[in-house]
Amino acid sequence: MSQSRPLALLVVAALVAAAVLVAAAEAQQADGNKLEGLADALKYLQELDRYYSQVARPRFGKRAELRPDVVDDVIPEEMSADKFWRRFARRR
């Protein structure tokens, strides 16, 4: 009876160790799948970037900038905001 107790503890310890090893192996395999998925996503994003860099063109000259060209274009106190915006709009 005294010898069966340590033997049972040894069997339980071996089963726990085996369970830990199996769990670690599955976790390592899952990390490998994550890396493969990440590599696939990066490849897809690179292909999208290559496609859109060929298809999309910059729109130079299509939009007017809404900021004054010169620092002196600050609204003078005697000029109303409507006059200032009309003068600014004429410049376009």
Curated annotation (Swiss-Prot):
Coiled coil: none annotated. The keyword Signal applies. InterPro entries: Pancreatic_hormone-like_CS. Widely expressed in the nervous system. Expressed in corpora cardiaca, hypocerebral ganglion, frontal ganglion, protocerebrum, antennal lobe, tritocerebrum and thoracic ganglia. Not detected in corpora allata, pars intercerebralis, circumesophageal connectives, subesophageal ganglion, abdominal ganglion and abdominal perisympathetic organs. The modification Phenylalanine amide is found at F60. It comes from the Eukaryota. It is found in: Secreted. One of its GO terms (biological process) is neuropeptide signaling pathway. GO terms for cellular component: extracellular region. Residues 1-27 form the signal peptide. Keywords: Amidation, Cleavage on pair of basic residues, Neuropeptide, Secreted, Signal. Residues 28-51, 64-92 form a propeptide. The keyword Membrane does not apply. Belongs to the NPY family. Accelerates ovarian maturation in females. The nonapeptide is a truncated form of the predicted neuropeptide F sequence. The predicted form, which extends from 28-60, is probably processed to a nonapeptide via cleavage at a K-X(6)-R-Y motif. Initial cleavage by a prohormone convertase presumably occurs C-terminally of Arg-50, with the remaining Tyr-51 removed by an aminopeptidase afterwards. The predicted form might be expressed in ovary or midgut. This is Neuropeptide F.
